[in-house]
């Protein structure tokens, strides 16, 4: 027998792991399992929930398909998301095989009454105390001695960059956290934080998580260029527009059955607006051209093929939806199809990009002076045949 015989083929392409970022050697599945639905506390607020049995079933399906990358937060489902994931890893004995990302900064004790916890101001924000309490609670709930990726959930504008980055670095030095991430934060803050970390010998951020989908492309203005420059991975959330990427037939079925859809943070309800219907039609057209079974898988592939080091966070409660979304790993979109989807909802980068470009080509000033051949940008990984 060959001691270095190749590993067996993974059950699905989810098991073809890839390097997280240029600045991070961690290898993860190309799609993350979003765990905001895992847990049983948020149903009253318009969010789907899952009891422990259903949560374990979904986690098993993800793991058995080759997935190892889970995204959660201290606040999800009033802390039961972390608890269920921790119990599942302990029961399956697979903690070291998994890459678990969690977060701090949102008020994660909001599920407790003010009779139980009269003062909650220490359980929210970016402060060192909030960080300290949260990471210790997350370690306990996840039943682990370390967190793979620890995120600042949002920037609260009350702490200095030095306080946050020094505190995060200390967690890395103590072995409680391996890598650092940042979410829902302006590009200038992240750039300044990483510059401070490098200059001061601290640990920089290696991944950015933010809202990005075919209808919401604001991250393409400053955040994604910043990630490319900083050597950071990109973790888009809400990639399926809160479940509003659906066909007319699917929406009609939900209306008739009374199933409805997610309403948490959806201030205009669960039904699609005009833009979402237009986008769904465009995705349906592309799906028909390439023979894809699901328009959601086309929406995921669209993001993954725009830039390198993109790891979409895909949630949900049903195993069949998880498997349907894995079709994204088999889809290869042509430049014409990518442009067609780009044009469905025009995106204006604004000043100064409209004046002098975004660096993807030489601008009008250069072109007035001469002719150039530009080196191509690094491309995303395309599906393996």
Curated annotation (Swiss-Prot):
What are its E.C. numbers? 1.1.1.91
Q: Which one Pfam family would you cite for this protein?
A: Aldo_ket_red
Known catalytic reactions? an aromatic primary alcohol + NADP(+) = an aromatic aldehyde + NADPH + H(+)
Q: Which annotated residues bind NADP(+)? A: 238-248
Gene3D superfamilies associated with the record:
NADP-dependent oxidoreductase domain
Name the keywords, alphabetized: Aromatic hydrocarbons catabolism, NADP, Oxidoreductase
Q: One MF term from GO for this chain?
A: aryl-alcohol dehydrogenase (NADP+) activity
Question: What does the UniProt PTM comment say about this protein?
Answer: The N-terminus is blocked.
Superkingdom per UniProt: Eukaryota
What is the protein name stated in its UniProt record?
A: Aryl-alcohol dehydrogenase [NADP(+)]
Active site, per annotation:
76 (proton donor)
Q: Which family does the entry's similarity section mention?
A: Belongs to the aldo/keto reductase family. Aldo/keto reductase 2 subfamily.
Name its GO BP terms in alphabetical order: catabolic process
EC class name: oxidoreductase
């Amino acid at each position: 027998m060959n001691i270095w015989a190749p590993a067996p083929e993974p059950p699905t392409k989810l098991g073809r792991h890839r390097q997280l970022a240029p600045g991070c050697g961690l290898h993860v599945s190309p799609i993350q399992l979003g765990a905001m639905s895992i847990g049983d506390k948020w149903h009253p607020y318009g969010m789907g929930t899952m009891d422990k049995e259903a949560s374990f079933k979904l986690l098993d399906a993800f793991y058995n398909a080759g997935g190892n990358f889970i995204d959660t937060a201290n606040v999800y489902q009033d802390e039961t998301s972390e608890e269920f994931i921790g119990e599942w890893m302990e029961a399956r004995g697979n903690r070291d095989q998994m890459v678990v990302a969690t977060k701090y900064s949102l008020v994660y004790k909001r599920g407790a009454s003010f009779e139980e916890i009269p003062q909650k101001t220490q359980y929210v924000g970016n402060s060192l105390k909030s960080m300290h309490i949260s990471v210790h609670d997350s370690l306990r709930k996840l039943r682990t001695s370390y967190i793979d990726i620890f995120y600042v959930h949002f920037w609260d504008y009350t702490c200095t960059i030095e306080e946050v980055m020094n505190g995060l670095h200390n967690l890395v030095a103590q072995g409680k956290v391996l890598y650092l991430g940042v979410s829902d934060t302006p590009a200038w803050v992240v750039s300044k934080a990483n510059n401070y970390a490098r200059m001061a010998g601290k640990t920089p951020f290696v991944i950015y998580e933010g809202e990005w989908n075919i209808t919401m492309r604001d991250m393409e203005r400053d955040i994604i260029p910043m990630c490319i420059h900083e050597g950071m991975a990109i973790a888009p959330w809400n990639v399926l527009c809160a479940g509003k990427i659906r066909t007319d037939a699917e929406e009609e079925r939900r209306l008739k059955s009374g199933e409805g859809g997610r309403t948490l943070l959806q201030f205009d309800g669960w039904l699609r607006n005009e833009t979402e219907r237009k986008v769904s039609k465009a995705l349906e057209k592309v799906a028909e051209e390439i023979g894809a079974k699901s328009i959601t898988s086309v929406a995921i592939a669209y993001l993954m093929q725009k830039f390198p080091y993109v790891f979409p966070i895909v949630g949900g409660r049903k195993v069949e939806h998880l498997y349907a979304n894995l079709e994204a790993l088999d889809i290869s979109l042509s430049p014409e199809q990518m442009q067609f989807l780009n044009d469905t909802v025009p995106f204006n980068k604004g000043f100064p990009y409209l004046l002098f470009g975004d660096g993807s080509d030489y601008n009008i000033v250069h072109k007035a002076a001469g002719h150039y051949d530009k080196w191509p940008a690094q491309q995303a990984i395309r599906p393996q045949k």
